[in-house]
């Protein structure tokens, strides 16, 4: 069976205020063409169909067009919801469109109920595991703890239990939206850390022939049976070096490692990150290759130059972002806020702030637990808003935990201290 594995379309997303709708439409054209020309037997879409819980109308229309075109080809498609999607909204009408061969799996209760397809080699069971927010699905799945590993492990227990009832030789594909240990992250993925842990071990997927993963935006191989397709388009400058693609997965007999081929996606415009003093950037002949790219420019001048964006735009007409990061020693007290926070998690930021306001005395174990609980509470509240559609304004995204989580966590510790 030939399976086309894709994910993280993020329909409706813009790139630094530049609409990507035309590029996303071009990707859908490419997807449909690939399905037709490469004799694809099934399409697997591993979550984050939309970028927001309440997507713009144009994104919904594009998704509708994609579904109609895939259905017209008569190729079964299995999709799951991701952490950016509203599972309930995406799943509306799922039972009806099942009849057209489009199988939307957004309910955690259905983790152990596969979509069963067949080819000359027999049956293939596709298990759709939508994004599982630990605080919301732990009880439903009977997980022993509220972490990602526990809830995904409980879902996979259901998969393996069902698979054990299938005829010998049944092959299996799991679609999941998660951060698996060993995967490379980028700036455009929403943090899903719970209890200080964001990732799950690859071993959680033991026992299946192929795990089609979504969430991470780089196309990558965790093991020969566990892969991320990545997003079809770049959604942050941290993805400038990515080769955007899909996986064409060919399943052989049960137990055999699948054969996987990368299928490149169209690139609407390359990305470039340039860094240096403004006069160097304007004069360097080596940067000529970036003059038609979307550009992120980081200026290292000791003093902020006059009208830097206008000057850069004369050479790089598609420059989108400007970062001012003067070169100073890391220990310099004037080092930029961005420099000091670079690479630090919400939890680390909150713990450092507690130490700062208490004259160097950081949080103890009990306070660290409070910080973790507060961060998880903010994440659960945000995700509940996505699931239920409450508190979400059309055209706006739910704030990542990083935008308010550290502050909420510090507030929890402060409140406990007052008691």
Spans of features found by a protein language model:
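Divalent metal-coordination and catalytic microenvironments
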Residues: 8, 48, 63, 82, ...
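Residue-level detector of anion-binding/catalytic polar loops
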Residues: 41, 76, 103
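Active-site-adjacent helix-turn-beta-strand microarchitecture at beta-sheet edges
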Residues: 80-125, 209-213, 218-281
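Short beta-strand segments at enzyme active-site cores
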Residues: 41-47, 79-81, 171-175
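N-terminal active-site segment of His-dependent metallophosphoesterases
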Residues: 1-68, 72, 373, 377
